């Protein structure tokens, strides 16, 4: 058996090492290219993911800014609406107060008119009662004076007219 095929000989191991080395170089070069290509593909995938993440982050930032702007606008509008409502409440209060004062004044005037009317009516009734009483007293005084004497028809007629005029 030749020496390079005998595993007990050093030449065998040198040949085996050379074949392994050449196999590694030959297949390693291809493997290196494949590994490099796989690493490049993985790097490209990672870069694409990073780019996508950056794009999503920018989009999220823009959305956040938009939402913050909308929120600020909504808060401004809410404050404006609240201020407007407060002004309207004050106006309604003032109007209600004015209407209440007007109603109170109108009722006061109506009460004064009723009181004045009642006073005038009472005064008229008192005057009528006083006139009737005066007429009755005058009639009784005249009747007492003329008792026994002949009654004058003119006096009787004047007394009758006096009673009708006083009423």
Curated annotation (Swiss-Prot):
One of its GO terms (cellular component) is proton-transporting ATP synthase complex. HAMAP family: ATP_synth_b_bprime. It is found in: Cell inner membrane. Keywords: ATP synthesis, Cell inner membrane, Cell membrane, CF(0), Hydrogen ion transport, Ion transport, Membrane, Transmembrane, Transmembrane helix, Transport. Belongs to the ATPase B chain family. Pfam families: ATP-synt_B. Its main location: membrane. InterPro entries: ATP_synth_b/b'su_bac/chlpt (IPR002146). It is a single-pass membrane protein. The chain crosses the membrane at residues 8-28. F(1)F(0) ATP synthase produces ATP from ADP in the presence of a proton or sodium gradient. F-type ATPases consist of two structural domains, F(1) containing the extramembraneous catalytic core and F(0) containing the membrane proton channel, linked together by a central stalk and a peripheral stalk. During catalysis, ATP synthesis in the catalytic domain of F(1) is coupled via a rotary mechanism of the central stalk subunits to proton translocation. Component of the F(0) channel, it forms part of the peripheral stalk, linking F(1) to F(0). F-type ATPases have 2 components, F(1) - the catalytic core - and F(0) - the membrane proton channel. F(1) has five subunits: alpha(3), beta(3), gamma(1), delta(1), epsilon(1). F(0) has three main subunits: a(1), b(2) and c(10-14). The alpha and beta chains form an alternating ring which encloses part of the gamma chain. F(1) is attached to F(0) by a central stalk formed by the gamma and epsilon chains, while a peripheral stalk is formed by the delta and b chains. This is ATP synthase subunit b.
């Amino acid at each position: 058996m030749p020496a390079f095929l005998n595993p007990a000989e050093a030449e065998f191991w040198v040949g085996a090492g050379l074949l392994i080395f050449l196999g590694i170089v030959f297949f390693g070069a291809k493997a290196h290219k494949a590994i490099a290509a796989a690493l490049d593909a993985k790097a490209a995938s990672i870069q694409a993911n990073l780019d996508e993440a950056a794009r999503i982050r920018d989009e999220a930032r823009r959305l956040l800014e938009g939402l913050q702007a909308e929120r600020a606008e909504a808060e401004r509008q809410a404050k404006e609406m609240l201020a407007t409502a407060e002004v309207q409440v004050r106006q309604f209060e003032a109007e209600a107060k004015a209407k209440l004062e007007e109603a109170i004044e109108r009722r006061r005037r109506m009460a004064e008119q009723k009181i004045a009317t009642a006073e005038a009516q009472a005064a008229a009734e008192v005057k009528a009662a006083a006139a009737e009483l005066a007429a009755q007293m005058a009639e009784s005084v005249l009747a007492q004076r003329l008792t026994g004497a002949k009654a004058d028809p003119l006096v009787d007629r004047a007394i009758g007219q006096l009673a009708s005029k006083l009423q």
